[in-house]
Each structure stands twice: as structure tokens, then as C-alpha cells.
Design a protein with these regions (language model features):
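Membrane-embedded transmembrane alpha-helical bundles that form the catalytic cores
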Residues: 1-414
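Positively charged, low-complexity/disordered segments
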Residues: 415-417, 421-422
């Protein structure tokens, strides 16, 4: 923990208050949740309690626990929203004021952005929710918990850890093992190769094209996005390799964050292979709670009741999933940055996944009519190529300076090549 905080202080001592606040809030929340559950168990074991009394005690405890979780969410994500997205919000408010003919303008201001705040915020909130669900026991030692939140190899770019997998490793005895250290160094070296040989070299080409969206057309725009694809993967996956290699040298095994994403057969599979820990976080803490919520259940029943066609009944099941996908990828877009281009980037992926879910019965019918073998090698190859193309289209929104530049680059793909060099 001392080493992790020393590393964190190197990025600036002024921002350490944010990680301390997150640590204290989520640690305290875990203790309160655990204590409430223990007190409930003791109360329920008391003699002479009627069934109604037990039910009332359970409801009271459940309400209190929900309030603790909501308060933790508001505090942790509230801080994240303020420090990371305040100027984006102000700029949009100013745009609305101007659109309605107003002359007033709210001034933007600069706040220090704490190192790794998105990662440790998500990681610490997962702990609170897991304690609430009874998946893990609350940690009763704030120093041990602080290590989980601040573990230095992963704090800058992940992977997003889970308490039930990391805490036992932190508490376990680790002996010197030369083979483990060598393997960790090898993985770090592989990460350095991806970063400095692949990503940095590809970045020269992608920067040239994306920094001058009006100058390059045709094949050069495609070359630019392919270079960015290599740059992004080399930079991100290489960084993760270095993180995991360094952590492995300490005897701590982190969750995989990449699994050959460019061999995916669909956008959904791509996101199960790319930034895996973010995807599983969204699945466990957003997708399932939202898609299985009372509101989505009522929506599904409404469609089922008022739909007379087979497709309508299918939509009763598919719609909650589609809406959950859209919500997840809206959050993923916001996660990537405070700009509309990132929101469009996220929604692009969400719309494709939702559309695929809605059209699944239609696709199945087409396969039967055309007698296409979905397991055939040629078809599987086509799926990989199709997914790769769709993914690379999304990179235009991710890497362009503005949303306008992204659309400009996409338009220029269909235009004749005007540059004789790159």
C-alpha cells in the first residue's frame, strides 16, 4: 500500500485527496452494509418474533442498505463527474442558452484530473455492490482495502479488478520465485514491443491523416484508420501487458483485458474480447440490473400483451436487452471522454448490437431460405472481416478531433484519392 501511494503521489500530491475520499466512502459503506446484515441476522433469531415483524425488519434493513449504496454511488460518481465532465456540461449549457437567443455565458474552469480516477471509482463501487449482494464479506481493515483501491500497476489503465479475486492474493504469502519474475519481465518486454515498435510507429501515420481530415481522401483515409487501429491496440494492449507483467512479478495475477479481439465474429463478441474487464463490469452492474428491473419487466409484459404477431412477442423479450445495450454503450462512450464524439462512438456500437438483437429472427429465416451454413469456414471468415470493418468505422469517432472531423473523414473515403504520398 505504501508503494502504491508513493507511486500515486508522484503524479501530484494535490489529487491524493480524491482517492482517499473514494477509499473512505466505499470502505465505510462496506462496513455499514455488513453490520446491517449481521444485526438483521441476530434480530431474526430472537424468540417470539411474528412473521410480520420479521418481514418488517427485512424491509427496514433492505431500505437502509439501498440508501447506503445509493449514497456511495452519488459520492464516488459525483466526484468523477465533476472533475472529468464539468466543462463538457458547461459548454452544452452555453450552447442551449445561445440556441434560445440568450446572451449569458457560464465560464469554464480547470480542475486537476486525478490519476486513474475512472478505474479506481469503478473498482471501488464494484466492491460496495458485491458486499450489498452478499458476494463478498466487507473488509474490516482500511489499510488492506486501500491497497485494493490504489494497487499501483493497474491504477492508470486497468484492468478493473474485483475484490473477491484480488484481496486473497494481496493477503497471501508470496515467496521469491525466479521463474515468476522472468515470466513477468517477458510479458513486460512484449508490452514494450507493442507500445514502442507497433503503436508509436503506427501513430505517425494515423496522426498525419486524422490531424488533417480535409487533406486526405480515398485509400489514405482507410490507411489512416488502419494505422490508428494498430496504434490503439498496441498502446492499450501493450500497456496492459506491462501492467500484468509488473504485477505478476509481485505474485499478483490480474484479469485478462484482451483476447484476440480482431478475430471476433460480431460486435458483441468484440466487446467480450476488448477491454474485457470494463465489459464484465458493465454486464454485472448495469446490464443485468437494468434489463431485469421492474420497469423493463413491465415493458416486456406490455409488448407481450399487446402484440399479436410472433415478431411482436419476440420484441417483448428483446426490447429490454436492446435498451440495456444502448444504456451500456452510452456509458462506455462517456467513459472514454467528455465529448460528443465519444458518445456517438459508444452509441454506434450500442445501435449495432441492438439492431442485431432485433433482427435475429429475420436473419435466422434468411439462413433457412438461402441454406447458408453458419459454421462454414467461408462464412466465419466473412463475419470476422465484417466485424473488423464495423469496428474500424467506430475508430473515426474515437480518434477524430471533433465529431465534424469524424464525419468528414468518413465522407472522404468514397472520394477519389488526392494525395500521391502519405
Amino acid at each position: 500500500m505504501i508503494l502504491s501511494y508513493a507511486y500515486y503521489l508522484c503524479s501530484g500530491y494535490k489529487t491524493v485527496v480524491f482517492i482517499l475520499l473514494t477509499t473512505i466512502v466505499t470502505f465505510t459503506s462496506g462496513i455499514l452494509l455488513e453490520r446491517t446484515e449481521d444485526n438483521l441476522d441476530k434480530s431474526l433469531k430472537a424468540d417470539g418474533l411474528a412473521r410480520e415483524d420479521k418481514k418488517a425488519l427485512k424491509e427496514k434493513a433492505k431500505t437502509y442498505k439501498k440508501r447506503v449504496v445509493v449514497l456511495a454511488l452519488l459520492l464516488v460518481f459525483g466526484v468523477l463527474a465533476v472533475v472529468k465532465y464539468h466543462n463538457f456540461a458547461i459548454e452544452n449549457v452555453n450552447g442551449i442558452i445561445k440556441a434560445f437567443g440568450g446572451n449569458g455565458r457560464i465560464s469554464t474552469f480547470t480542475l486537476l484530473l486525478p490519476l486513474g480516477i475512472s478505474f479506481y471509482s469503478f473498482q471501488s463501487i464494484s466492491y460496495v455492490i458485491d458486499v450489498y449482494r452478499g458476494k463478498v464479506k466487507a473488509c474490516n481493515n482500511i489499510f488492506k482495502y486501500a491497497l485494493f483501491v490504489s494497487y499501483f500497476p493497474q491504477i492508470t489503465q486497468g484492468p478493473i479488478g474485483r475484490y473477491d479475486r484480488l484481496a486473497p492474493q494481496f493477503l497471501a504469502e508470496h515467496k521469491y520465485d525466479l521463474a515468476v519474475i522472468q515470466h513477468g519481465l517477458q510479458r513486460m518486454a512484449w508490452g514494450l514491443f507493442k507500445k514502442f515498435i507497433i503503436a508509436d510507429r503506427a501513430g505517425v501515420v494515423s496522426d498525419l491523416v486524422f490531424n488533417n481530415p480535409g487533406q486526405y481522401h480515398g485509400i489514405y483515409v482507410i490507411i489512416g484508420v488502419l494505422a490508428y487501429c494498430a496504434q490503439l491496440y498496441g498502446d492499450f494492449a501493450g500497456g496492459i501487458d506491462m501492467v500484468m507483467g509488473a504485477s505478476e512479478m509481485f505474485g499478483i495475477h490480474l484479469d485478462d483485458n484482451f483476447r484476440q479481439p480482431f478475430f471476433s465474429h460480431s460486435i458483441g463478441e468484440f466487446w467480450r474480447r476488448w477491454h474485457i474487464t470494463l465489459g464484465t463490469w458493465m454486464k454485472d452492474y448495469v446490464f443485468y440490473p437494468f434489463s431485469l428491473s421492474k420497469a423493463m419487466n413491465k415493458l416486456g409484459k406490455f409488448f407481450k400483451k399487446h402484440s399479436k404477431t410472433r415478431f411482436g412477442k419476440y420484441m417483448a423479450k428483446a426490447l429490454p436487452i436492446c435498451l440495456a445495450d444502448l444504456l451500456i454503450f452510452f456509458i462506455v462512450g462517456v467513459w472514454h471522454g467528455a465529448a460528443w464524439k465519444y458518445i456517438v462512438y459508444g452509441m454506434y456500437n450500442g445501435i449495432i448490437m441492438s439492431f442485431s438483437s432485433i433482427m435475429a429472427p429475420v436473419y435466422e429465416k434468411m439462413f433457412k431460405i438461402t441454406h447458408i451454413n453458419k459454421t462454414a469456414r467461408w462464412y466465419r471468415g466473412w463475419q470476422i472481416i465484417r466485424t473488423f470493418i464495423l469496428v474500424n468505422i467506430s475508430w473515426y469517432f474515437d480518434n477524430a478531433a471533433t465529431l465534424t472531423d469524424a464525419f468528414l473523414s468518413l465522407i472522404h473515403i468514397s472520394e477519389p484519392t488526392r494525395r500521391s504520398y502519405i
